[in-house]
Amino acid sequence: MEAERETELSQLLLTELLSYQFANPVKWIETQDVLLKEKEINHMIEIGPSSTLTNMAKRTISKKYSEHDAALREPRLLQSFDEHAAEIYCETMQIRTQPHKSSAPQEPVPKAAPKAAPPVPVATAPLPEPGRQVSTMPINVEDVPIQSRDVIVATVAQKLRKHFLDIDCSKSIAQLCGGRSTMENELVGDLSLIFDPLPDRAEEMGISELSQIVSGSTSTTKLLTAHGKLTASIFTHKMPGGFTITDARKHLEVQWRLGVGRQNAILLRMATEVLPSRLKTREEATMLLDKIAEAYADEQGLKLQPMTEVPMSAPTTSSETKVISGCSDVELYTSNDISLPESEALVNAQKMLNIVKTENDTLQEKMDLLTTELGDDFIQGILPAWSPAKIRKYESCWNWALQDLLLLLNSILRGETSLDNSVTRSTCDMIVRRSNDRLIDVMRYMLSSNKLAGDELLVSMAKSVLAMLIEDSQNWLSCAQTSRFFGHELHNPIDAYAQGTPGSDSVEVKVKTRSQGTWKYDTSLIDLYKSSLACVREDGLRLKGKTVLLTGAGPSSIGRELLQHLLVSGALVLVATSRFSPTACRELQNLYMKWGSSGSQLVVCPFNQGSRGDCESLVQYIFSAKAKGGLGWDLDFVIPFAAVSEEGQIDELDSKSEKAHRIMLTNVLRLLGSIKQHKQAGPRNTSPVKVLLPLSPNHGVFGRDGLYAESKAGLEMLLNKWYSEDWTSYLAICGVTIGWVRGTGLMAVNDAVAAEVEVRTGVKTFSQFEMAQRLAALLVNPFAHEVEIQPVKVDISGGMADTTDLRSILSDIRREIKQDSTSTPTHQHLPSHHHVDEPEIGKPLSSVSPMANLKLNFPQLPDYEDDISPLNTLSGMVDLDRTVVITGISEVGPWGNSRTRWEMEAFGEFSLEGCIEMAWIMGLITHYNGKLGDDMGGEQYTGWVDAKTKAPVADVDVKARYEEQIIEHSGIRLVEPELDNGYDPRKKQLLHEIVLTRDLAPFAAPPELAKQFMQEHGEKVDAIPGSTENEDWTVRLRKGAVILVPKALRFDRSAAGQIPQGWDARRYGVPDWAVDQIGRETLFALVATAESLLSSGIVDPYELYQYMHVSEVGNCVGSGLGGQQALKKAFRYRYHDKPVQSDVLQEVFSNTAAAWINMLLLSSSGPIRTPVGACATAVESLELGYELITAGKAKIALVGGHDDMTEEVAYEFAKMRATVNTDEEEARGRMYSEMSRPMTTTRDGFVESQGSGIQVLASATMAIKMGLPIYGIVSWAGTASDKTGRSVPSPGKGTLTNARETHGADKNLLLDIHFRKDRITRHQQQIQADLEQDLKSLEQRFAMSRSITKSEVDKMSLFLHKEAIERNKQVLKSLGHTFWTSHTDISPIRGALSAWGLSIDDLDFVSLHGTSTVLNDKNETSVIQSQLSHLGRTRGNPAYCITQKYLTGHSKGAAGAWMINGALQALNTGLIPGNRNADDVAPELEGNDFLFFPHHSVQTNGLRAFSITSFGFGQKGAQAIIVHPRYLYAALSDAEEFHQYRRRLNVRQRRATKFFQRGLATETLFIAKEEPPYTEKQESRVLLNPEARMEGQHYKDV
């Protein structure tokens, strides 16, 4: 009964309570006031299913009691059963763990005191810093409602990306938008949603006027709604985490006593702040608010007084602090909703950490012991360096032989080389030793063709050299014993580089062999050695096909000199080096390029001879089969010359001494032992490996050299072990005692005393060359064969081994030298040719430093008599109206502009002028004209100043001061995140989807954002409105909600060709609004266009309309990918809900850049074509511009391409495996700058880059008339697609069609320029005769008929003259430079060259697409080779290949334009830039005998024409033929026309140079046009009148 009664009473009580609740109003607000104010409750617990009342209490406390609580330092603790059950029941303190078993007695653990439950953070105002507290309250300010004007200004400012205060309220929306109709329409649309109705033509009203009109008709609700939308973004994306709009309002209320209305005004101004990134702390946010509040007060004329503060002790808690008194670390961590099993797992993890710590301590003790015993030097000295990925191979001597030949011939033709020069003879010797059938073909062609041009004497010298080289090469290939060069025996080519006179000294050598247990002199071997040495001196080594392992070949070492002999001999050499680095590899690669003869190979690998593992790995690599990644060698020679210098007596032996002993003795033996094992396991009947052991006469005679003498003496024991151990069949030992070798790392400190030592002791000291030559003789048969039979000791120490008391002699000499140096004035030691200038007394020292000559580098005009007159056959044969020339070039790229890029491409370094331009581009310097600051003297100054310090920088100091920084932040390099919105490839961000397994903590969000969360997550989110309409809501994501969490991965494409760091379009003069709105790739194109016009000598684009109609200026600028940054914003930023301009879509289109070029610079109404040809875009653009002008549709056309680089595109290129894997390249020891290696054996993908390139095309008539510079003639340009396939990026051979023609086409009479010239003359004579006859008939009719007036006769006469001109044009079309277009049996390439009297043999060089991908480079060279072969290029006439992308990377749409610019610069300077990353040209390219791949830049005696090819994804193949401008000048009517053009050109160039220099100083190279060249009234008349031309700056009488 008792239980039933309790149940009945419970049901009744519940019913009554529910009835009471439903029947009576809830007075929770009053209840809270009673609890919080009257009762002063500071700890409340809510028991219920959710935290409803707790959340309401938090908001009430935050709004009404936060200041009260802060002043009294009384924090309130609010808890709910739903969220804080564990704390309420103190469950977090009941964590049990298994006690650790131990035999030791345990002391009793004192009972822990009860722990207080942690307080829950309450959203109160931030408390002051410790030591500060509120003392005086600010003055209350009268509040005002939200103003319509503020909402309008904020809306406009946010859309225009300007600050609130930058909006001129007297201007209209249309004026503020600057003619951007899309932006204007969007603003009107946004305002119409707020102000309904919006007055008609609101966009034309001033902001102030519009505000007054709409202020009375708009509800406050709409204004507050608009306010919420305007301010939400900045709090979501730019404020620190947890800092909400409520916090901002509370700060303004507490700190400044501002009401809601004025808070709204300040927040609207804050919404227009342009912050580069999210603020990190609340302090930064409040400082920003305070700054805006003060500015607002000044604007409104208010006197605001902030809250003052006085010292006070720090509060114990704050709104962002959780305190759990007395909890352990584990308990504190597990109190955050961590279950007991998870807590136990943490405890177990702690146990494992303790175990690991104990083991680490033990290991550390052992390491400390080893470090104490062995020392740091020894431990570091045994670390392995071996890395198979880093191994480099060099074997393309076939290409370097051709390079040497062409460098030599061009040097002779320029008069820079004499034939009796020893270096010239050495070069010739090396050419002979590397000769092959292909090289002899080249020599024969050069000898018989007109390629050798210039001074007759120099040409004769070059031909003599060629004749001798041909003879010697043929003899060499036929193994003739005596080869002669200019009457001299063919010498060892290294002799020319030797110091001293090799061979002039007597040879002192001692050779010992073992006989009856003792070592005795062997006179027969001494004679044999001398014979070998004579052979080496006369003809060098001959070890073709022999394999050699060499260690110790560092700079200035004997090994390095010996390596030269080995490479000349044709040996295959593996150099194992401990100083492996890009620099070391480059040194060795240059060594191979210079000395590697036919059949030779150089392999370079990282190796530490102090590491046992490296010794074993090295030998394993040598003997392993090629199929297994090894060399597959059976070694012939081992030369272990690695050595380490030492110092110290026996009581100073240290870690370094033991390391050196290990390197020079212990591991030499290990290395040989490993070789013995592999020889033993390999094939039988192989010759033993001949080992050249480096011995020393220093058996302690020098002293103070650590264990050096002991190490060398220990090696000698190996000669005896040959008899006592079982490896005689595998190793043959030759111990060689090496004497005093000057300049090596071991002996360089003794060089100063060497000469005196020779005088006093008779000991001979050697240069490195002399010693290497003597060592090389030991490798020559039959002496080397004797070593296989028995060990041999050879003493070539120059008598040093027999000298006693050498140390005391050295001490005496050093003491005497020191005494002489202290007693003799320094200048008396100088040789007689060194003169010390002393300033004259009273003569002031010059303070003038040289100035840089900043200029545009216009092409140099050729001399008429020497260069143009011989081509006079072309005179009158060309229709200049239909001839296309390039008059301007420019680019924006990783190396700045076209001028600075050319300096790096051609010379590998910047000039002073180049450094100044780059420093200006990167914002390192600015030009200043005015008084300096007081701290710098306050004087008047004009010149460069440092951009940061404002300190003056002289021109001459710029290179020294900034070049290192310029190089580091230009070109291909590690991606710099600041250049791409923080993109860091080492931390590429992706999003990972996660389903919540528990409820998250609540957070505040603006109402609109909270509703959006509800829209997405539905029942998986709780959203509780604030107490007022605009107050933040409380949002909590529930279990089951899906969220996206950022994650980062290491992206393996971290190198790129980015624009120079600091590049800014504003620096050129591009307006701020344009930079903010326009895509970056478009900014590249705008700047490049301005510079291309300037390089055309055009300082004002509107000048064009003085010479042509506005419809005759074309625009063909294209892009491979379009607006990548805009695409990123439209998709990624929109998805992330980041601020994005509303008209971003317009920047996505590929034709937008061309539109901006026209809108801001040209104002043309001519044809506009936008090519989208992926990587071939720029050359396709050239074709379009070429067609516009040849078709008469334009007289000027802009062509080129542009593309940006984004992480999204980079990632997708990587997925296609098109770009180089930079992680793998780094593992191979490559620097970022050498990761693009076109045409090399190790090429592995392109390096992406960004930028733009623009050319100005013009008809030849217009170029001559305007006096524009001419960089080249576009003789032809075309595109071709490929065959059926399934791969879009796959390279094809469609461009072979550019050489399509039938067999025997080269015999076509039309290809004979003299034949065509004769035909043109006859046709023109006939036309002239017809004209004269027609005019005579017209005169007769006029005389006979009175009905025909004089005016009519004049019109008829004019018609007849025009008809004659058109007939002449038709003749030139059929027989002039386009004669071939109507003859299908003549290929475009042949026709384009023949038009200017050139043949396929006159195509001097080709600029290759050369992306550094395996397939492209192989396919492209194959296509060019086939074209040249099909067109009948003469055998032995290779074309130079330019592969520019090694330097710039691949910029997609701009790539072809950069190539055109570089090729034009080569054409006009005669200098072919080399590919400095071409360390080893791929062997599969050797068969392309019409192509040559230079590493060094080659200065030629002049160039005639070139081909450029470009290939793009999507079956786009493009090619163009460009000819030197001198052929156009020859086509002019006479010399006078050329000289008139020269005068116009000089005037234009001076004007452009002046504008350029002023533009750099004033940052106005780009001047955006504000108005079209005609007035609004003139527009229709100008567009409709083809004869309309500007006069000066205006159109008149249109």
From Swiss-Prot:
Q: Tell me what this protein is called.
A: Fatty acid synthase subunit alpha
State the disulfide connectivity: none
**O-(pantetheine 4'-phosphoryl)serine PTM sites in chain numbering:** S181
> Which keywords label this protein?
Fatty acid biosynthesis, Fatty acid metabolism, Lipid biosynthesis, Lipid metabolism, Magnesium, Metal-binding, Multifunctional enzyme, NADP, Oxidoreductase, Phosphopantetheine, Phosphoprotein, Transferase
Q: Where is this region: Disordered?
A: 96-134, 818-844, 1280-1301
- Positions of the catalytic residues: C1175 (for beta-ketoacyl synthase activity), H1409 (for beta-ketoacyl synthase activity), H1450 (for beta-ketoacyl synthase activity)
The Carrier domain, residue ranges: 143-221
- State the reactions this protein catalyses: acetyl-CoA + n malonyl-CoA + 2n NADPH + 4n H(+) = a long-chain-acyl-CoA + n CoA + n CO2 + 2n NADP(+); a fatty acyl-[ACP] + malonyl-[ACP] + H(+) = a 3-oxoacyl-[ACP] + holo-[ACP] + CO2; a (3R)-hydroxyacyl-[ACP] + NADP(+) = a 3-oxoacyl-[ACP] + NADPH + H(+)
> What EC number(s) does its UniProt record assign?
2.3.1.86, 1.1.1.100, 2.3.1.41
- Tell whether Ribosomal protein is among the UniProt keywords: no
Listed Polar residues bias regions: 820-829
Q: Which GO terms describe its molecular function?
A: 3-oxoacyl-[acyl-carrier-protein] reductase (NADPH) activity; 3-oxoacyl-[acyl-carrier-protein] synthase activity; fatty acid synthase activity; fatty-acyl-CoA synthase activity; holo-[acyl-carrier-protein] synthase activity; metal ion binding
This chain's source organism reads: Gibberella zeae (strain ATCC MYA-4620 / CBS 123657 / FGSC 9075 / NRRL 31084 / PH-1)
Q: Which InterPro entries match?
A: Acyl_Trfase/lysoPLipase, Fas_alpha_ACP, FAS_alpha_su_C, FAS_alpha_yeast, FASI_helical, Fungal_FAS, Ketoacyl_synth_AS, Ketoacyl_synth_C
Biological pathway: Mycotoxin biosynthesis
Please list the residue ranges annotated as the Ketosynthase family 3 (KS3) domain. Answer: 992-1524
Belongs to which family? Answer: Belongs to the thiolase-like superfamily. Fungal fatty acid synthetase subunit alpha family.
